[in-house]
Structures are given as C-alpha cells and as structure tokens.
Amino acid sequence: MQVPFASHDCPLRVAPHAQDVRNLAALQSLPEVLAERKLESIRNSWSIMEEREPFPTRRAWQDLSCLLLFGVATCGILLTSCLCPSKPPTANSHQGSEVLQPYLLFAVASAGAVGSLAAAFVCTLLARKAPKCVAWAALFSRPALTTLLAFVFVFGAASQGRAAPGVAGVLLAAFGIWQLVVTCREQTRSVSFTAKLTEVTSDVIKCRPCFYSAVAVGVFLGFLWTTICMLALARAFVEVHEVTKCILVSSVILLFAWGSLVVTNLCHMVHCGIFGLWYHGKDCPRTMLSSLRVAATTSLGSVCFGSLLVWFLQGLAVVAQCVQRIGHKQSKGLAFISSTVLGRFIVCMDDASDCFNDWALIQCAVRGTSFLESAAATYSVIACANVQYIMEDLLLSSLALLSGIVCSLAGGFVAASTGWALGGASAALVGGSIGVMIGMIAGAAALGGVSSGIMTVLVCWAEDPLPLIESHPDVHLELESKILGRLRGNPALQQHP
C-alpha cells in the first residue's frame, strides 16, 4: 500500500542537512519503507559531494574494470576479424569485395565525416543565433523522422514493385500524423522554456568558443570508430569463412553499438566539463583539452560502464515486456507471474534507466566520482531542488534527435555521392549507410552538446543557485516559478497521510 507522505508547505529547495520524507516532493508518493531507503541514499550522497569539491586537481581512475572489459572486447573482436582464416574465393565474391575495398570505405567515411561536421557546425550556430527556432524545429523532429521513414518505405515499394513496404510506409505516415497531433497538443508549452535555457548555453558558447573544437573532436571520434568497425565488418563479410562469419558479424555489430554509445557519452562528458567550469567560475586556459583529458582518461571507465549499463537495462526491460505479453496469452498462472513479478521488474528497470543515464555523467565530469556514486549524487541533487519538474518540460532528447537527423542526412548524402562517383550504386548504398552512422554520432556532439550544457547548468544550479542568479537572474526566477507551480498543482502534496 502506498502512503502519500504529504505536506502543504513542501519547500522549493531543501538544505543538505534538513532532508526529510515530508519535505521532499520526489518521495511523497512512495511507500514508507522505500521512501526512507531513498532518503538515506540522498543523505549519503550529499556527504560524498561535500567531501569532494568540484573539479579537483587530482582525480582517481574510476570503474577501471569496465574500461579493461571494453579494451579487451575491442582488441579481441577486431583482431579476430583480421586474423580469421580466409574462405576460398568464388565467382560471386568478386563484386562484393570490390564494393567493400578498404580504400573505398575510408573514402566514403571521410566524405561522410566532412558532411556531418559541416552540418554539426550549422546546427550549433543556429542554436546560438536563433534558439527559439531551433526549439520549434526540435519539437517536430520525431514526427519528421517518422514521416521520413514512411517516404523511404513507400519509395522502396514503388521501385521494387512490392506491396508490403508500401503498407508499412502508409502505417508509418499515419503514426507520424498522430505524433504530430499529440506534439501540438501537449508539448508546445515546452518550446519557450527550452529556448530560454538554450540562450544560457548560447551565452556560454560565446565566451567559451572551445565548444566548437569539442564538436569537431566528437565528429572525428565518430569517424574513427565507424571506420574501424566497418573495415572489420567488411572483411568478415567478404573473406572470413562461413562457419565463423555469423558469430563474428554479430560481435562486431554489438561492439559498434557499445562503442558508439561510449563515443557519444564521452562527447557528453567533454561538454559537461566545459559548462561546469564556466558555472563554477574555474579559470582554465585550455578548457576543452582539460575536459577531454578527464573524459578520456580517469573517467573513461565510467563512460564505458554507464553506456553498457543503460544498454543492458533497456534490453532487459524489452525482454521482460515480451515475456509479460506471452504470459498473458498462455495461462492464468503465467499471467499472474507476468503481472506481478515481471511488472515490478519492468518498473525497476525504468527507474534504473532514469537514474543511470546522461545526467549521472555530469558528476563524473565535475567531481570525478564513479558512475554509481555519480548516479546517486545526481538523484539526490535533483530531488532536493525538485529539478524533476523542470526536466519534464524540456525538449533535450528532441534537440539531440534534430541534430542527429540533420547530420545524418548531410553525412549520408555526401558519403553516398562519393560512393556513387567511385563505385556506382552499390558503393553509394554502402557509403550512405556509413555516412548516416557517422552523422548520428556527430549530431550527439552538436545540439547534443547544447543539451549537455542545459543539463549541466540545471544540476549545478540545483546544488548552488548563486552563480546563475548573478549571471542570468531572469532564468533563475523562471526555474523557481515553474517548480513552485508544479508543487502547488501536485495532488500528492494536497493530501494528509
């Protein structure tokens, strides 16, 4: 039974040593035992934060075991793909080997990186010059992506003369229209608020132009990782014996997915370091290099661990949902197990994914704590300052998605054009795919960096609002007014236990 620990005067911000179940809005609707457990975790996390000042001069290596696991997996899989015995050549393998030649893959990847970099710079400049226009564009990025996929399916059906892709395209188009209607009804109020916080990051970018070099580093890392994995994948397709091809191709694809998350989160940490140094007023002559050094050395293990953990938890949640649906169809006993055990497991996975995400990496960049310590510290800061009400009204994921779409289209088009010029239609298809993958990572380094800046400013403001009061007092007042409005409208706070 859930007991709503309610209070009529839940404060906007709770001091570190005054935390209680009744004055933290995040704990109001939780059961008593769980609320007390979370309260103890919040207090322990605050004690850890008080022991470690922001941006210490010396940092210990964190989560080394996961860094070693990522290094061993990368070296093992890539070396295996290079050293596996080749299969005997056949008549059909000549055409595939021509398309997947290393020089051709490197050429299209380089072209895709150039196109993605140009698009990333354009997105960043637009966010700096016209933040409200970018926020409106981000609002409609999801319906636009769905509609774009619908056109791809319809075009494929028309070119191949098959009905199934056309039906899928029509269904996707209908889903895109539904997304557009829901977006217009429920999320338009978030545009001006997101644009307001984007203006803060724009001011930071003006005084810290090293942000653009961080974007370039992200695009370069995306190009490097994609090229390495595609070369290994090409050899597995063309030269490796059929017996080991399936295992090796699957391993390379999984490694590419994990590594792409690592590159994306590494760029996120670099941006968090840049904005965190600005917020705390730390003078650093080489801001970007300092943030990159932290993200690529002492905190790289936390980046690898966080990327793997989020991916694993989301995968478990998907599997649990599938098992739950099967259980409801099979028998009453399985349906009972599905609705109780698996239902709670899915809720736990959703809560864990909310904690173990990009927000946790902010404390890794600021304080150099481990990933689990950072996740707990971030949750405690957000709970004590009621930042969860601000997070609900932001379009952070839409900003990253918008830049991902733009950079993917630009990178895919340039890479496909290069492939067409070098090797015809087949090379254009391969080049377009590689360009899209590089563009997705580049998008995370562009407007994804703006999202990282907003997240860092919010977490730092939750811990200490004074720097934001001095630099942007109007933004501080708007943040507090939004939290106050949500607290007054929260039903759990209007009841007595």
Describe every region a protein language model picked out.
Residues 3-497:
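Eukaryotic membrane transport/trafficking proteins
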